[in-house]
Amino acid sequence: MPYMPSLSQLQQTDAFLRRHLGPDQGEQQAMLDALGLASREQLIEQTVPPAIRLQGELNLPPALDEQAALAKLKGYAEQNQLWTSLIGMGYHGTITPPVILRNVLENPGWYTAYTPYQPEIAQGRLEALLNYQQMIIDLTGLDLANASLLDEATAAAEAMTLARRMAKSKSNRFFVDENCHPQTLSVVQTRAEAFGFELVVGTLDDLAGHEVFGALLQYPDTHGEIRDLRPAIEQLHAQQALACVAADLLSLLLLTPPGELGADVVLGSTQRFGVPMGYGGPHAAYFASRDEFKRGMPGRIIGVSKDARGNTALRMALQTREQHIRREKANSNICTAQVLLANIAGFYAVYHGPQGLKRIAQRVHRLTAILAAGLEQKGIVRLNRHFFDTLTLEVGGAQTAIIESAEAAQINLRILGRGRLGVSLDETCDERTVEQLLAIFLGADHGLDVAALDAGELAAGIPAGLQRDSGYLEHPVFNSHHSETEMLRYLKQLENKDLALNQAMIPLGSCTMKLNATSEMIPITWAEFANLHPFVPRGQAQGYRLMIEELEAWLCAITGFDAISMQPNSGAQGEYAGLVAIRKYHESRGEGQRDICLIPSSAHGTNPASAQMVSMRVVIVECDKGGNVDLEDLKRKAAEAGDRLSCLMITYPSTHGVYEENVREICAAIHAQGGQVYMDGANLNAQVGLARPADIGADVSHMNLHKTFCIPHGGGGPGMGPIGVKAHLAPFVANHPVVELEGPQPGNGAVSAAPWGSASILPISWMYIAMMGPQLRDATEVAILGANYLANRLGGAFPVLYSGRNGRVAHECILDLRPLKAASGISEEDVAKRLMDYGFHAPTMSFPVPGTLMIEPTESESKAELDRFVEAMLSIRAEIAKVQDGEWPADNNPLVRAPHTLADVIGEWDRPYSIAEAVTPSAHARAHKYWPAVNRVDNVYGDRNLFCACVPVDAYRD
């Protein structure tokens, strides 16, 4: 009888690991052979300093297979209770059109793409973002919009800082209407304190008594009232201050746009444009301003330019405002924003069109008006005279009974206290919702009929002088794709223009573009995770609490920290949150004078940008010839700072792609002067299972869940940047004004709008860790193996700029193109653009060293894909040789004219190289050709001729 293995022998404890890792055991051994090594352990011994190595396995549960992990998480999800939440406060029920759900949110062609720094291979999502910007411009009545921020509260804080930069007022005081959403007020207070601004909170009537540089007003306000803001705005302008208005986007289909009222900045959330509440996020915040403030605008702006053939091409405009270029002088530390969600909101407008959107807004308003009329007939006092979708009601001693009745109907109301309740209707509401609410407030025998109320004359909720009469969304893109067939094809046309992970490796250094497994993505669209309001009673979110608590425990085990704050919803926001905690810690010890932040010259641009956001003075620490932090320079500057030293911000492994041997000594030098160590978590993918930041000496670190822990980049967001802290910093992390968190001190300000940030994407990281368990170390080791394999194979053609012990690199490596540029005139940009012709996304250009390419393969890429990349790079090196040898002119060769498009091929060809050499330079390109949508984009033209709205349809035609 043939041998039959037992069930225990057939159990696959590494089932997901084998799916996640690109190279199998045989390929890994071949890569090790190329390095002259016998095992991965030998590679790690040669690469990672012994002093920081983690002894033993990570303290994590054994790995689950995909089905078991999904089943466990589904069990958690089912403990969330899906009530009808009419709480409002900036979060509303919405309907995601299925064509958008399936073809964007659930489509790796959209969610695995990177930020469009390389516009030639990102025209699809750039067009989608331009549509989004046009939508915001039209609805707000302003001149310019960016391509999203993290959430409404963060956008409000950014508006305050823009006002300080741009207002001519000399005041240091900022006014906030007390009727703003409480979470917005808290985030603005945190930012104002960090910048040293004086914050005045009061009613609009109080504004006249204060000299300010700006003010934040809510429209409609948090209680639903619609006020004419023109008098307040005129007062602000009279004292050369800026008027910032936080506006409900759906209401602007019916209300006079704030721009027409005189507002300088308008901001808010696009959540109710088809993006689920998700227990707080992710959602794209919008941000619009007058044209004169464009160079003070935070975040990415998509602009119209032209390509080398003179055709219309889109790109990210005015990048010199941003942190990756201006560093501590940047307008903001914003890096990752909410591109995927902005695209969904923009597509929502494209699909519904202006009439469809207006119908949704009118329906919500009509339902609210019917409810208001019925309650008024029965004597319920409404505290807001005017309304769009929200009623604030005075119910006196009946409050408790009404709340109990609402709970029996599984409806959440906003409980304001002192006999006041709020109710906000939304797109998901209908006549049945109104019937339930009438019964809740009036009792079952109220005698009212919704149909009869609807048939009667209803008082207008919107003041006559604030009813919108201006047009919007007149561009053809918003009036052409209303059938599902047309929408489906439009989405596919845009997707086909872009290069994402579902087509090729994206070898961007410092970005960790690893696999975003399908099983990790599935739970985010489960209704139990997607449809919860962030301010529901905790008992209704028990599944979320269990999942988040478990994820926090796992992240503590992985990093060595004592506590985790999940609130920051990007890496840059994690930096800001960590620095705020450090500042509060020093102040608690009577050392508030500590304001110097040491930052190595190689740091990410977000580091100095974040430091300036908490009023720290940045002092740069030099690096030595080996790319390491110059220890003597660091010790000298730490000593010079003395009792003013606040912290050091350091990335580990370094942004130069090496494990610095003296990192413990670096941390000790800072601690000796009373400072704290902030470790940038951008390169955590090279530590997991091998070392832990807290053990190395870090006091606080953020974790890019959208890098190391598999949340996809989404074309520029969403992300999550929770911070880990040691016990002494735990009391000083962010709290929340609506949902008080356990651990942080009561009264600590918030750093984002929702208590747990973008909570609905946390299941992605939970799934990844659950399915990997202690085998996370394998992922780290294979990532290091891949980087060293590439460095070994490419080093002869392109020198590897920095290496660590035994000539090894960490999980990424930097190729130095400066000698080649000097010899041939071919730049790192030429090589990056030429890679597109081979079907690759470019590596990171000129960071952290100008004239270089930084490559990070991640553990998810197979040896075959790595070899294909090597072959492309070596082929490009041979092409450079032809330029050096004079075979091709320096100004007319495949590199300087890359990338090549279909328009090149079908046009007249008069170049000294063949069409085949241009567009099919490799066997893979011949078999699986990816065509960039445009030729090389003219960046200078785009900034000199700034245009950031939709262009005529004919402009996209060649």
Curated annotation (Swiss-Prot):
Its cofactor is pyridoxal 5'-phosphate. GO terms for molecular function: glycine binding; glycine dehydrogenase (decarboxylating) activity; pyridoxal phosphate binding. NCBIfam families: gcvP. The glycine cleavage system catalyzes the degradation of glycine. The P protein binds the alpha-amino group of glycine through its pyridoxal phosphate cofactor; CO(2) is released and the remaining methylamine moiety is then transferred to the lipoamide cofactor of the H protein. The glycine cleavage system is composed of four proteins: P, T, L and H. Belongs to the GcvP family. This is Glycine dehydrogenase (decarboxylating). It comes from Stutzerimonas stutzeri (strain A1501).
